[in-house]
A protein has these predicted regions:
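FAD-site-proximal beta/loop scaffold in flavoenzymes
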Residues: 2-10, 15-90
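A short alpha-helix-loop-beta-strand transition element characteristic
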Residues: 41-45, 95-101
Length: 101
């Protein structure tokens, strides 16, 4: 728990810290070990490379969500994962699909 007071923060343990600015950053690291073992293409910094249909470098294997790398981007949000899931479902069932964008 952090409490903000003008140019000072006071942490839960009551320790103060004088600040001009606070930057908070969080990130994700894709879990792609299985893809590496399967010799699928993965990005330099991780993530299973997919195309617009969410296919990996093996056209019979799909990847969606935080493990997927599309356009050199990893999406740490749930909404892109839902869109990838819809795209994959459409492709697998032969439905028209604009692909993941």
């Amino acid at each position: 728990m952090v409490k903000r007071l003008s140019n000072r923060m006071v942490f839960k343990d009551k320790a103060p810290l004088e600040v001009d600015v606070i930057v908070f950053s969080a990130g994700i690291r894709p879990q792609d070990e299985l893809a590496r073992q399967a010799e699928l293409e993965v990005g330099e910094r991780g993530g299973i490379v997919i195309n617009n249909q969410c296919q990996t470098s093996d056209e019979n294997i799909y990847a969606i969500g935080e493990c997927a790398l599309w356009g050199q981007k990893i999406f740490g949000l749930v909404a892109p994962g839902y869109t990838m899931a819809r795209t994959t479902a459409d492709v697998l069932t032969g439905m028209p699909s604009e692909g993941f964008k």
